[in-house]
Amino acid sequence: MNDEEKHLAAPANAYQPNMHYQQQQEKQTGYNAEYDTHQGGYNQNQNQDYYNHSQGGYQMDNMGQHGGYQGNPNDNYNNQQPPPYTPDFPPDYNYKPNPNAATFDEAFAVPKPKWNDKIGLVILALIFSGYLALSIIVIRAYAQTHSFQGWGIYSGENDYSLNTHTLILYAFVLATAMVLSLLYFIAARVWTKQFIWITYILHLLFSWGTAIYYLVVGYYSAGIVFIVFAALTTWWFWCSRKRIPFATIVLQTLIDVTRANPSVLVISAVGTVVGACFGTWFSFTIVSIYVKYDPDNRNPGCMTTGGSCSNGKLIGLILFAIFCGYYLTEVIKNVIHVTISGVYGSWYYCSKSDQGMPKHAAMSSFRRAVTYSLGSISLGSLIVSIINFIRQILSVLQQDARQSGDTLATVLLCFVQCCFGVLDWLVTYFNHYAYSYIALYGKAYVPSAKATWKLMQTRGIDAMVNDSLIGSVLSFGASFVAYAAALVAYCFLKYTDPSYNSGGGFYAPVVGLAFVIALQVSNITNVSLKSGCSTFFLALARDPEVLRVSYPQIYEEICRTYPPARDKLDI
C-alpha cells in the first residue's frame, strides 16, 4: 500500500495535520505523504469562516448568536474516545470539548472516569498521617509545658529554644503574608495595565532595600544573599522589558475572565485562608518540635510522652516536618490550580457559544480535582517536593562546607545545587500545564505531562509561554511578599530580643522559615492567575482557531504585540 492509499484508508477520526504542520514534518523527516484537502485537509473559503474536516473533524460555519465556537453538531462528545498518544504526533486536535454543553462534566466529558494514579493517593495518605501523628505528639508536649514556654512575648522561662514568643512572631508573619498576597491580587485587577511594571519596580526596590538594610545592621550573610537575588532580578528586568506589552495583553485577558467569573475570586480568597490556616498549624508544629525534642537539660518536654530528646532526633523531625508541610501546601495549591483550570477552560471553549458557560464549572472542576484527579495531583506535588527537599539539604551542606573552609566541597555542592535548581524549574514549568490538561481531560499525571510537552513543542508555544512573563511576574510578586514577611520576622526578633536568641543563632532558621511560609501562602493566592495562564496557553496550543473565531480582538492583539504568534498559531 503506497502513501496515498494509506492516507485514504485512515480512520475517520484520525488526526489530519494542517498544511503548516505538514510542511514542517516534510522538512524535518522527509515525510512525503500527499496532503489531500478533499480527504480531510484544511480548506479555507474566502467568503466565510469555514473549517471542515470531512472525516470527522469540526466545522464553524454556524457561529450562533454570540459568534463563538459552536463545534460540530454531528459529534457525539459523551461517547467520543481520545485517540492513543504516539510519539510522532500530539494528541488528536479533533477530540474537542463540547461548547454547547449545559454542565462542565458534559463539556469536558471523561468517557470512563476512574481514579488515576492511586499510588499518589496512598503516598498522600501516608505523609499526611505521619505529619498528623508527629503534630499531635509535639503539640501535646507544648500544652503540657505551656507555663514553662510562657503566655506572651516575655513571660516564659524557656531561654534556650523556640517558645511562645516564636508563635507570636509567626502570627505576624502569616498576617503579613495574607494581607500582602490579597492586596497584590487586588492590584492585578485594579491596575492591570500597570501591574507588571508595578511588580518589577516594587520587587527591585524592596529586594535592594532589604539587602542594604541587612548589611547596615550587620547581618552580612543574609545581605549578600539578597544582593545576589536583587542583581539577578535587575538583569532579568532589563532583558525582558520589551516583552511587557505582550504579557500585558495576556494578563488583561486573564483578569477579564476573573471579572466575568466571580468564582475565581472566591476560590482565591478561600485558598489564601486555607493556606494561612495550614501555615499556622505548620508553624505551631515546628515550634512544638523544639519544645519537645530540644536536648537541653532544662527542657521539661523531654519528660513528656513521645520519646527522649536528642539533637539528631530534633534535626531529623524538623526536616521531616518541613518536607511534609511543603508537600501538603503543594497539594493544596495544585487542587486550586486544577479547579480554576476548569473555569478558564470553560471560558475559552464555551463562553461565546449559544449555551454559554457551563453551570457550576468551578464546583464540578473541584469535585473532579479531589476525586479522580487527586492521585495525579499528589504524585506531581511529590516530585516537586522531593526536588526542593534535596535542594534544601544541599544548601545546608554547602553552608557547613563554607563555614569549615572546604572550598572544593563548597564549589561542588554549589554546582549540584544549581543542577537541581534547573531540574526543579523544568518540573514545575511542565507541571503547570500537566495540571491544566488533567483538569480538562481527566488523564493521569504522566500521560498529561507527555501530551502537554509534545503539544507545546509541536505548536511552538513553549517559546511563546516563556515570552509571556506572567509566571515570572507572579513569582516576583510572591517573592516580594516573602521578603516582606522575612523582614517582619527579622525585625520582630531583633527588637523584641528574646533570651533564646541572645547569641543570634536563631536568626537564620526563624527568618528562613518565615520566608518559606509566606512564599507558599502567596503562591496559593496567585495560583488562580498562574492556572489561568497555563490553561490559556494549553487551549491556545491545542485549538488556536477557537480564539481567532470566538475572541478575534484578543487574537489580533496577541499577534500585534507578539508577531511570531501568527506563524506559531497557523490554522
Swiss-Prot record:
It is found in: Cell membrane. InterPro entries: Choline_transptr-like. Residues 15-31 have a biased composition (Polar residues). One of its GO terms (biological process) is transmembrane transport. The keyword Magnesium does not apply. Pfam families: Choline_transpo. Residues 39-52, 71-80 have a biased composition (Low complexity). It comes from the Eukaryota. It is a multi-pass membrane protein. Residues 1-118, 188-189, 233-263, 333-369, 428-472, 525-571 are cytoplasmic. Residues 1-96 are annotated as: Disordered. GO terms for cellular component: membrane; plasma membrane. Residues 81-90 have a biased composition (Pro residues). Residues 140-166, 211, 285-311, 391-406, 494-503 are extracellular. GO terms for molecular function: transmembrane transporter activity. Keywords: Cell membrane, Membrane, Transmembrane, Transmembrane helix, Transport. The chain crosses the membrane at residues 119-139, 167-187, 190-210, 212-232, 264-284, 312-332, 370-390, 407-427, 473-493, 504-524. Its main location: membrane. Belongs to the CTL (choline transporter-like) family. Probably involved in transport through the plasma membrane. PANTHER family: CHOLINE TRANSPORTER-LIKE (SLC FAMILY 44), PROTEIN PNS1. This is Protein PNS1. It comes from Yarrowia lipolytica (strain CLIB 122 / E 150). The lineage of its organism: Eukaryota, Fungi, Dikarya, Ascomycota, Saccharomycotina.
